[in-house]
Amino acid sequence: MSDTFCVTINSCKENGDKATVGFVIATAALGSGKDTMVFLSTDGVWAAVKEEAAKVVEGGPFKPLTELMENFINAGGRVVACAPCCKKRGI
């Protein structure tokens, strides 16, 4: 069995809370020593667009989505986006 932990995020523009909490959980998994990736699918692929991610600010106790994403990536996390989902949305 793999030690990779995968968080799937399928919402961003319509429900920023889901994207925010997804990156909080993924970062916690990294902190526990798990190889961790985030898979962006359906509307979650909007998190891969910097301008869209910057609009997601859920407020305390959560940091803005862009900061959560940067922290996750800088800590060694990987982010993968669904190519067909991106294509459908013109990303």
Give the predicted meaning of each segment.
Residues 6-20, 51-53:
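Short, glycine-rich nucleotide/cofactor-binding loops
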Residues 7-8, 37-41, 48:
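Short, conserved beta-strand edge motifs with alternating hydrophobic and charged residues
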Residues 42-45, 86:
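Short beta-alpha junction loops
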Residues 44-58:
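N-terminal beta-loop-helix "entrance" segment that forms/cooperates
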Residues 19-34, 38:
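Histidine-anchored nucleotide/phosphate-binding helix
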Residues 90-91:
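Short, intrinsically disordered, charge-balanced linker/junction segments flanking boundaries
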Residues 54-85:
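A glycine-rich helix N-cap at a beta->alpha junction
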Residues 36-41, 79-83:
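Short internal beta-strands
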